[in-house]
């Protein structure tokens, strides 16, 4: 049987303990995949985006030849993801997973099986956010950490890169990389996946591939989730703006997301007001979430970007 080569790409930034724990789980799944007769030879790549290379010792402590370490000092998620694309240039497939995620059993084989069925350009799996048990109920009922699901094989128009398998031959043929303009703001995966589809690629959903993300307490707050809602709206509009190929298309994009933003602000504010009136946390929280996304879209339509992952120079 011909052998396909697969690289599991783990991007990391100053999470050595989580990285070490996650790698042990990933390596167990790599062992299963390599031995199960699918004809796939898998290995692991860790891309360390810390300028001082803080993950090097964590990788070295594993003493496992299946794990390669790459230091990418240029700040930003886009730089890290593009480094993974470059380091995996001799592979057929690249599976992205983040350093704060833990894959469930079958995560990797499910991605591969879904890809083998129709050979799409990309396969997106689920990321399940485990919110702390003592989190503000308002945050939970607001659905800030809920994500849509689809039947396996469903084609989708946009994908996140937290659990994403790429057919590298197709990605290279389409000439798509992660845009550095969104490296510190987030949303680089939105633009990347939309560009894949625009150039003729296909992205399909895999519901059986699941990675868990344990949400830190500092992120399960009203302030953080509302800021993230704004950022999601902002990056969605910016991605559309960056996809525009000329002045006319940029004008259309700005108008489109100005109108969408205003509609969300109006609808979200109304739902929030109803929630306050009837004492419904669900309507109040979801209304504010919608309104904040709309505000982010308005800013994105103007070209304003918020670098959520900006780093201190100190």
Regions found by a protein language model. Give the residues of each.
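Non-catalytic, C-terminal membrane-associated alpha-helical segments of glycosyltransferases
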Residues: 227-231, 246-314
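Short, well-formed alpha-helical segments that are part of the catalytic scaffolds
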Residues: 15-34
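Short, flexible, basic/aromatic active-site loop/helix in glycosyltransferases
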Residues: 125-126, 140-157
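Conserved donor NDP-sugar-binding/catalytic core segment of glycosyltransferases
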Residues: 106-137
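A conserved acidic beta->alpha catalytic loop
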Residues: 45-58, 101
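Short aromatic/hydrophobic "clamp" motif used to bind/position activated sugar donors
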Residues: 93-94
